[in-house]
Swiss-Prot record:
Organism annotation: Azoarcus sp. (strain BH72)
Stored HAMAP family: Ribosomal_uS17_B
GO cellular component labels: cytosolic small ribosomal subunit
Protein name (record): Small ribosomal subunit protein uS17
Signal peptide span: none
Amino acid sequence: MSEQVEKVRRALIGRVVSDKMQKTVTVLVERRVKHPLYGKIITRSAKYHAHVEDGGAGEGDLVEIEECRPISRTKTWRVTRVVEKARVI
């Protein structure tokens, strides 16, 4: 009777633009949408603060973030994995 149903959490992929805070990174997520009237493809972007426990994500890394419970006033996302490390030139 009391089955535990796990909620489907939103997951996004974005690039880390700042890692200056302790245990927090700022992730820029870009998405492409079609303009409703003119039909042109537009790039929309949003920045999210995400919790990273062991400092595994650095600036320039491509990461996957997922929604979680509120960790602080601005953090409701957590880094689940690093998809691609930043290349040092």
